[in-house]
Amino acid sequence: MGDLSLQRAAGALGAWVSGVGLADVAESDRVYARVRQALVENEVLFFRDQDVAPQVFAAFAQCFGEVLDHPAYATTEQSDAVQILESTPENPSKIELWHSDMTFMAEPPNFTLLQGKIIPAVGGDTLWASATAAYASLSPGL
């Protein structure tokens, strides 16, 4: 485990994380605290090259609180805390349009985690938007 390093990904939100992995966060309270603070400040964090088992991904997720399941998705065989979002001709995506994760719940989660396992060379983009920045940019009259 190295030192946590952040590189801004865009103006409104997001940062690339290097120097620590998902397993490091799950194993170290100090690393978790730094990553959580970075997440709060940047709203989206990107960890590159994290080909971890579902159990490790679940342990990482559980650091941030209770893991909620989405009723539309199956879980992995290795962990009930990790679900599979698939988009193939046989199983097209259920979330092709803009959405905000789990906002149908009375108390939606604070964070959402996504790990890309099989990603197409073209297309398949996932985009993020900052509701914080959008709200802050509203005119005072609104």
Model regions and ranges:
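Non-heme Fe(II) oxygenase catalytic core, chiefly the N-lobe of the double-stranded beta-helix
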Residues: M1-L142
